[in-house]
C-alpha cells in the first residue's frame, strides 16, 4: 500500500481554517479525504457547519490540544484510519488534520517521524498556516503559538485581507517573510484556493528545491539590529483565548522571537565536522529549532546533499549531481525561536573544508 499523504492545517483562532477545509471537502476533485478535527473545548461547533452537506468521514477529537494533552489520541486515530483502509472498511486518499487554534504544529509533525507504525502508513506532505490579516498584529505580538505556526509553515494563506489597508497588508507580508522566508504567501478570500496550492506540496520531501523568498535574501544582505524579547517556552492553554481586536498597524520591523536566517558558502563542507556541529546544536537548541533545510556542497561527493529537520529530528539524502557549470553553493535556512545566529554561522563556517 502506498503511503497516505497527510496535511496539517493550522492557524490562529478565527483565521478561517474551517472555511478553507469546507471548500476543500465540497469541491469536485474526486479525492476522498479523511479529516481529523481537533478543536479546543468540550463541544465541537464546527461539526454542524461541516457535516451539513459533505459525505466525508470526520473524525473528531474534542477536549484538548493535539500538541500537549492528546498526542496519543492523534497517533491512535491515524493508526485506526490506516488499519481500516488496509482492511477495506474505509476508503480515502489522504488525511487532513485541522489543529486547534492554540496548537503548536511541531509535536503534530513529529508524530509522523517518531512513530514507526505511522511512518509506515503516512507521508507528511505539508503544514499550511492561515493568518487572519485583521488580527495578525496583535496575535503575533501576544501569542507564541501564532509565531510558531508561521515558523512551521510550508505555505501561508492570508485571510480577511479585505478588512485592512494596503499598507497594513504590506507590513504583514513583510513581517511574515522575515519569520519564514521558505513559505510562499497567498491572500485568500473565504477559503478560495486551488487544490494544487493545498495538496502535494511536498514540504517535507528531501528534495533539492529550497525556496527562499528572493526579497528575503535581498534584505538579508544588510542585517537588522535585534534586541531580543524573551518568551516562555511552555505551552500554556487557557480555556478561552480572547484576542484584542486591534488592527494590523505598526510599520516598523517587529522583533519577533521567531526569526530566520540563511547561511551560504561557495566552499565545500567537511562531512565529519558538519555532522559534529549539527549534532551539537540540535542537542542544545533543538526545542527552539522549528524548521531548517539546506542544499549542501559536501567534499567527497559530486551530488548535492539535501538535509532538513524539525526540532531534534534531522535527516539527509543525496540529491542530483551538480550540473556542469553550476555554482556549488551551499545554502541553509534556519527558522527558530531566538536562535543564536552568530553561533550557528560561526560553527557552520568552521565546518567548511
Residue spans for each PLM region:
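C-terminal accessory "lid"/substrate-recognition subdomains
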Residues: 155, 164-323, 327, 337-353
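Nucleotide-state-sensitive switch-loop elements of NTP-binding domains
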Residues: 2-139
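A secondary-structure boundary/capping signal
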Residues: 9, 36, 132, 159-160, ...
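Structural motif
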Residues: 87, 119, 145-148, 253
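Non-catalytic interfacial helical region
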Residues: 107-117, 134-143, 150, 158, ...
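Conserved beta-strand/loop subsegment of P-loop NTPase cores
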Residues: 34-36, 91-96, 122-131, 150-162, ...
Amino acid at each position: 500500500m502506498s503511503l497516505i499523504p497527510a496535511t496539517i492545517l493550522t492557524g490562529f483562532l478565527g483565521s478561517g481554517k474551517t472555511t478553507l477545509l469546507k471548500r476543500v471537502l465540497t469541491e469536485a476533485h474526486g479525492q476522498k479525504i479523511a479529516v481529523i478535527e481537533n478543536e479546543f473545548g468540550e463541544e465541537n461547533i464546527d461539526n454542524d457547519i461541516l457535516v451539513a452537506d459533505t459525505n466525508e468521514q470526520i473524525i473528531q477529537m474534542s477536549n484538548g490540544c493535539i500538541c500537549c494533552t492528546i498526542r496519543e489520541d492523534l497517533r491512535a486515530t491515524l493508526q485506526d484510519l490506516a488499519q481500516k483502509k488496509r482492511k477495506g472498511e474505509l476508503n480515502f486518499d489522504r488525511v487532513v488534520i485541522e489543529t486547534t487554534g492554540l496548537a503548536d504544529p511541531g509535536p503534530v509533525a513529529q508524530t509522523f517521524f517518531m512513530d514507526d507504525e505511522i511512518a509506515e502508513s503516512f507521508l507528511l506532505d505539508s503544514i499550511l498556516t492561515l493568518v487572519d490579516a485583521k488580527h495578525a498584529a496583535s496575535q503575533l505580538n501576544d501569542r507564541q503559538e501564532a509565531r510558531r505556526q508561521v515558523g512551521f509553515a510550508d505555505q501561508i494563506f492570508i485571510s480577511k485581507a479585505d478588512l485592512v489597508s494596503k499598507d497594513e497588508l504590506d507590513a504583514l507580508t513583510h513581517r511574515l517573510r522575515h519569520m519564514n522566508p521558505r513559505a510562499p504567501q497567498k491572500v485568500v478570500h473565504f477559503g478560495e484556493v486551488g487544490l494544487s496550492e493545498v495538496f502535494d506540496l511536498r514540504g517535507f520531501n528531501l528534495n533539492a528545491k529550497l525556496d527562499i523568498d528572493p526579497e528575503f535574501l535581498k534584505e538579508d544582505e544588510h542585517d537588522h539590529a535585534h534586541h531580543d524579547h524573551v518568551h516562555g517556552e511552555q505551552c500554556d492553554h487557557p480555556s478561552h483565548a480572547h484576542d484584542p481586536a486591534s488592527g494590523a498597524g505598526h510599520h516598523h520591523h517587529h522583533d519577533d522571537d521567531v526569526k530566520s536566517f540563511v547561511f551560504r558558502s561557495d566552499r565545500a563542507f567537511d562531512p565529519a565536522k558538519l555532522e559534529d556541529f549539527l549534532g551539537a546544536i540540535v542537542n542544545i537548541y533543538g526545542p527552539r529549532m522549528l524548521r531548517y533545510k539546506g542544499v549542501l556542497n559536501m567534499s567527497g561527493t559530486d551530488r548535492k546533499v539535501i538535509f532538513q529537520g524539525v526540532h531534534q529530528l534531522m535527516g539527509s539524502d543525496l540529491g542530483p549531481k551538480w550540473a556542469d557549470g553550476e555554482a556549488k553553493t551551499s545554502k541553509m535556512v534556519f527558522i527558530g525561536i531566538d536562535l543564536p545566529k552568530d553561533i550557528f554561522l560561526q560553527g557552520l563556517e568552521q565546518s567548511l573544508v
